[in-house]
Swiss-Prot record:
Protein name per UniProt: Peptidase T
Keyword Membrane: no
Described function: Cleaves the N-terminal amino acid of tripeptides.
SUPFAM superfamilies with a match to the protein in the record: Bacterial exopeptidase dimerisation domain, Zn-dependent exopeptidases
Localization (cell): Cytoplasm
Binding site for Zn(2+) 1: 78, 139, 196
Organism classification: Bacteria, Bacillati, Bacillota, Clostridia, Eubacteriales
Textual note on the cofactor: Binds 2 Zn(2+) ions per subunit.
One Pfam family this sequence matches: Peptidase_M20
EC number: 3.4.11.4
Any one GO molecular-function label of the UniProt entry: metallopeptidase activity
Gene3D superfamilies membership: 3.30.70.360, Zn peptidases
Keywords tagged on the record: Aminopeptidase, Cytoplasm, Hydrolase, Metal-binding, Metalloprotease, Protease, Zinc
GO cellular component, one term: cytosol
Length: 406
């Protein structure tokens, strides 16, 4: 039987960086390559009903081995890695018996406790890091490795009774499209867990309400020598728009349950400037107010510069899954119990982001999020503890056992 980190090291060799510009699903060929590889592996270890959809989703089912009426539990992870940094030619480094000090990644980069204050908690453990030139891909190939390893363990230990275990690997989560083509009905689970969290112990069932905002500003260009009273510089109107938003409610100044508006991109010249924002808030009313503020600012500026100067287009992306999870809190409570059984203290924090599970919960599949063990996702300083990965496998198995014993 393969060890969880051995699987992980195989998966990260496949470049699965997603790309929101391609407008196809999956957005990159590497995700299809990994999906086919996973489907073959699942078949080889004895999993039933393995299939890949046209959109590249991998679905499988390990059939129940007992006659009891046991809930059908799903475990889901995503195959893509973030567009933020290259996932090509990932060259992981193994750091055995970590000494709590700086780790030289190579290529002039150092992973240090001054940058990652949590590092000393991994002293004595075995870590997997990057070589400084790419991200690692623990988000979310660690989750995939943990699920497959847990499933193989069940197959090799038929004395462990379980109901139907549903497996799902999705493309394009990192560009917000992971649930777009997910076949909830065909998946057939009563509820599920994503393995897409970070530090050991993380258990999440709250996430941001999320929207995007596109702001387009139309100016008027006139020769600067005779522009007085005529020119409208769309770049300066854009600056005015941004200054009318709460200046302290931005990602770099917020934490916990605090929401924000985040200016992602600005493209402009005198006659036209475009702004791209994301809007985030945990509270439904606060989320509504943030979106309304964008329209109010547009209204004020149109009154000042002329109707049609500023146009705002808002699009909801995903909602806080808390309202869909709370009526079935046994899903969260069982995960807590499963962690405590293997000596892990659950860390229940809100997700300052989203997961496939957030959207799946509103599609009828309640899906909280479990840790994978990774740290510093999406960049060259990403790393993961093998010990944490092994504990994630234990948690999956404990969840399955708890439901089988009820």
């Amino acid at each position: 039987m393969k060890k969880v980190h051995e699987r992980f090291l195989e998966y990260v060799k496949v470049d699965t960086k997603s790309d929101e510009t391609t407008r196809v699903t999956p957005s990159t060929k590497g995700q299809l390559e990994l999906g086919k590889m996973l489907a073959e592996e699942l078949k080889e270890i004895g999993v039933d009903e393995v299939r890949i959809s046209e959109e590249g989703y991998v679905y499988a089912c390990l059939k129940s081995n007992c006659n009891k009426d046991i809930p059908k539990i799903g475990f889901i992870s995503h195959m893509d890695t973030a567009p933020d940094m290259s996932g090509k030619n990932v060259n992981p480094k193994i750091v055995e018996n970590y000494d709590g000090k700086d780790i030289e990644l190579g290529n002039g980069y150092t992973l240090s406790p001054s940058f990652s204050p949590e590092l000393p908690m991994y002293k004595g453990q075995t870590l997997i890091t990057t070589d400084g030139t790419t991200l690692l891909g623990a988000d979310d190939k660690a989750g995939i490795a943990e699920i497959v390893t847990a499933i193989e363990y069940l197959i090799n230990h038929p004395e462990i009774k379980h109901g139907d275990i549903k497996i799902g690997f999705t493309p394009d989560e990192e560009i917000g499209e992971g649930a777009d083509h997910f076949d909830v009905e065909g998946f057939g689970a009563d509820f599920a867990y994503t393995l897409d969290g970070g530090r050991i112990g993380e258990l999440e069932y709250e996430n941001f309400n999320a929207a995007s905002a596109k702001v387009e500003i139309i100016g008027k260009n006139v020769h600067p020598g005779s522009a007085k009273g005529k020119m409208i510089n769309s770049i300066l109107v854009a600056h005015e728009f941004v200054s009318m938003l709460p200046l302290d409610e931005v990602p770099e100044k917020t934490e916990g349950y605090e929401g924000f508006s985040f200016l992602l991109d600005i493209q402009g010249e005198v006659e036209k400037t475009s702004l791209s924002f994301i809007i985030r808030d945990f509270d439904k009313e606060g989320f509504k107010n943030r979106k309304e503020r964008f329209n109010e600012i547009a209204k004020e500026l149109n009154k000042k510069y002329g109707e049609g100067t500023v146009t705002v287009t808002l699009k909801d992306q995903y909602m806080n899954m808390k309202e869909m999870i709370e009526p079935r809190m046994h899903i969260v409570e069982t995960a807590e119990k499963a962690m405590k059984q293997c000596g892990i203290e659950p860390i229940k924090n809100p997700i300052r982001g989203g997961t496939d599970g957030a959207r799946l919960s509103f599609m009828g599949l309640p899906t909280p999020n479990l840790f994978t063990g990774g740290e510093n996702f999406h960049g060259r300083y990403e790393y993961i503890s093998i010990n944490s990965m092994e504990k994630a496998v234990e948690v999956i198995l404990n969840i399955i056992k708890i439901y089988a014993e009820k």
